Amino acid sequence: MPSAIPMLYLPDTMSAWPWQRAINPYFNEVKAASNSWFKSFRAFSPASQKAFDKCDFCLLAALAYPRARKEHLRTGCDLMNLFFVIDEYTDVEDANVCRDMVDIVIDALRRPHDPRPEGEVVLGEIARQFWARAIETASPTSQRRFLETFIAYLESVVLQAADRDCDAEHTVQTYLAQRRDNIGSYPSYAVLELALDIPDDVFYHPAMNELSLYATEMLIIDNDLVSYNREQASGDTNNILFVIMRQFNCSLDHAMAWAAAYHSQLEARFMDAFKRMPSWGLEIDSQVEEYCQGIANWPRGNDCWSFESGRYFGDKGREVQKTRCVPLLPKKERDTSLRQQDVVITSL
């Protein structure tokens, strides 16, 4: 009699979150334009491009920015695609190669109207075109904050590669600290303010900082819960569940429960900070409200995308969203050389 397949239970961390699913009405139109633009770079092999299509990163943008103007949704879609290609190119490289790639992207963002040199990795041209289009409709304050946060994200990519190189082990505290920049939430929040002009003294108020921090850590937990199955099968331990199990010497079930409980604490802290937001006058308050509502929607949009796209569960996402159960994948030896062949790093 065959043994039963082990099942993984995913806690429903978003069951009490008051912000409900919404999607941008320009989704299909903007997705077609953004994906056509991205595919024109031929950044992936056919196999890797097929995986990209299943992920449907434009769906993530449409769920994360349901009230964005058409041109700002385009920026969001392009940004999600840019995140993906940077992740795919750097995830198989050591810290030195990642450093070179990151420097190219930073230079392209700082000089969006200058042509990129021939023979350069295609990341530079993708980033240059993305930013040249984005700044046409972005407020000056949002441009500055996007660059600050996106460069911090890029630097974290190099740090993550260095961690891989030396098989670094983290505590929950140090893991969350390095993932806050690496998950890409802060530049994603900058898209929320493309049409806004929030002064620095308001934007960096402690209550505002708390909102973005708590939402970011919610995103980290939710992403790690849904990606754990695939990562445990491939031997990738850069996941908060592995960190919890190692630090507290506990089972996977206990790690899941710990992560879900911490997620609930973050939700409560977020709501408290939301209620403590001061007033700066009608004009500023309306912009702050729009921005904060956008941050609050991000965890909901990300959660919906995790099950509606094929990123984590293929065509079983809706079923998993209902049952919260997924068969535990068998472990296999991690072979990064195969992934390198799939990525096929492209130059201009």
Curated annotation (Swiss-Prot):
Cofactors that this protein relies on: Mg(2+)
Motif (DDXXD motif): 87-91
Key words of the record: Lyase, Magnesium, Metal-binding
GO biological process terms held by the UniProt record: isoprenoid biosynthetic process
Binding-site list for Mg(2+) 3: 223, 227, 231
Enzyme Commission number(s) of this protein: 4.2.3.135
Positions of short motif NSE/DTE motif: 223-231
Binding site for Mg(2+) 1: 87
Its biological purpose: Terpene cyclase that catalyzes the cyclization of farnesyl diphosphate (FPP) to delta(6)-protoilludene.
Name the record gives this protein: Delta(6)-protoilludene synthase 18
Organism (species): Postia placenta (strain ATCC 44394 / Madison 698-R)
Lineage, top ranks: Eukaryota, Fungi, Dikarya, Basidiomycota, Agaricomycotina
